[in-house]
Design a protein with these regions (language model features):
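Residue-identity detector for glutamine
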Residues: 16-18, 76, 111
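Generic detection of short hydrophobic beta-strand segments and adjacent strand-loop junctions
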Residues: 10-14, 78, 126-128
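Hot-dog-fold acyl-thioester-processing enzymes
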Residues: 1-71
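HotDog/MaoC-like acyl-thioester-processing domains
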Residues: 1-7, 84-134
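Mid-chain, well-packed structural core segment of small domains
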Residues: 64-92
Length: 134
């Protein structure tokens, strides 16, 4: 059984090729994500990673690692505090903040940090159900 306070961390990064693939999969071809010349005219100065692609890390972890296989990812609320860029290693942190054993659910803090700068990039909360673990 997983309990309040149990935590998990994973490091990740994305390549421009992965971002371009996500453009195709999602249909979001906003030049802010792939066009260096366009992005240079924005406050970000270079292409940024789609928020939904960043959130895919949460989906991967929730479904495969923590809580893992058999879990149902019910909800995600995320605040994107700073832009994320390709080629930078980030750390995603997960921590169980509450459980409801009667419903086999948990609320899990989901955060992304820039390892180099130590800054919080994404702050969120997720809900998951797992009949064997909560």
């Amino acid at each position: 059984m997983l309990e309040v306070g149990n935590a998990y961390e994973i490091e990740f990064s994305f390549t421009q090729e992965q971002v371009n693939d996500f453009c195709k999969i999602s249909g979001d071809f906003n030049p802010l994500h792939w066009d260096e010349a366009y992005a240079a005219t924005t406050p970000f100065k270079k292409p940024i990673i789609h928020g939904a692609l960043i959130a895919s890390v949460f989906s991967r972890v929730m479904g495969m690692e923590f809580p893992g296989e058999g879990s149902v990812y019910l909800k995600q609320v995320s605040e994107f505090k700073r832009p994320l860029f390709v080629g930078i290693t980030y750390k995603a942190k997960f921590e169980i903040v509450s459980t409801n054993p009667a419903k086999h659910t948990a609320e899990i803090s989901t955060q992304v940090f820039d390892l180099e700068r130590g800054k919080l990039m994404v702050d969120g909360i997720a809900s998951a159900m797992h009949t064997a673990l909560f």
